[in-house]
Amino acid sequence: MIPAKDMAKVMIVMLAICFLTKSDGKSVKKRSVSEIQLMHNLGKHLNSMERVEWLRKKLQDVHNFVALGAPLAPRDAGSQRPRKKEDNVLVESHEKSLGEADKADVNVLTKAKSQ
């Protein structure tokens, strides 16, 4: 068995180590600057990708609106006032026509459904 003097020395050394490390029960590991920068860049990239996807959808909506033959009213740069309710053009009231590419897509879809 270990003598009491040696045990007291070991206890004092262990106590000194515990008080001098100043860990306060918290994890000593911290994130490095490069890790934080990487996470920041990833967040910016994901935000940018969401914005690009939103813009792509909006442009597709505009393209579909023009493809349906809805007249576009010319607007000068200075007038940004809201339109009157009567000036709004409803897309459903216009006759929808299928272009050649759209007809091909419909034919492919009908063949796929029948299988």
Swiss-Prot record:
BP GO annotations: adenylate cyclase-activating G protein-coupled receptor signaling pathway; bone mineralization; bone resorption; cAMP metabolic process; cell-cell signaling; G protein-coupled receptor signaling pathway; homeostasis of number of cells within a tissue; hormone-mediated apoptotic signaling pathway
Effect of residue 58 to A: Reduced affinity for PTH1R
Propeptide segment residues: 26-31
KW Transport (keyword) present: no
Annotated keywords: Cleavage on pair of basic residues, Disease variant, Hormone, Secreted, Signal
KW Signal (keyword) present: yes
InterPro entries: PTH, PTH/PTH-rel
Top-rank taxon: Eukaryota
Effect of residue 54 to A: Strongly reduced affinity for PTH1R
PROSITE patterns found in the cross-reference section: PARATHYROID
Ranges of Basic and acidic residues composition bias in the record: 84-105
Effect of residue 16 to R: Abolishes processing of the precursor
Start and end residues of each stretch annotated as Disordered: 73-115
Subcellular location: Secreted
Summary of subunit composition and partner proteins: Interacts with PTH1R (via N-terminal extracellular domain).
Family, per entry: Belongs to the parathyroid hormone family.
Function according to Swiss-Prot or TrEMBL: Parathyroid hormone elevates calcium level by dissolving the salts in bone and preventing their renal excretion. Acts by binding to its receptor, PTH1R, activating G protein-coupled receptor signaling. Stimulates [1-14C]-2-deoxy-D-glucose (2DG) transport and glycogen synthesis in osteoblastic cells.
Entry's disease: Hypoparathyroidism, familial isolated, 1: A form of hypoparathyroidism, a disorder characterized by hypocalcemia and hyperphosphatemia due to a deficiency of parathyroid hormone. Clinical features include seizures, tetany and cramps. FIH1 inheritance can be autosomal dominant or recessive.
Name used for this protein in its record: Parathyroid hormone
Originating species: Homo sapiens (Human)
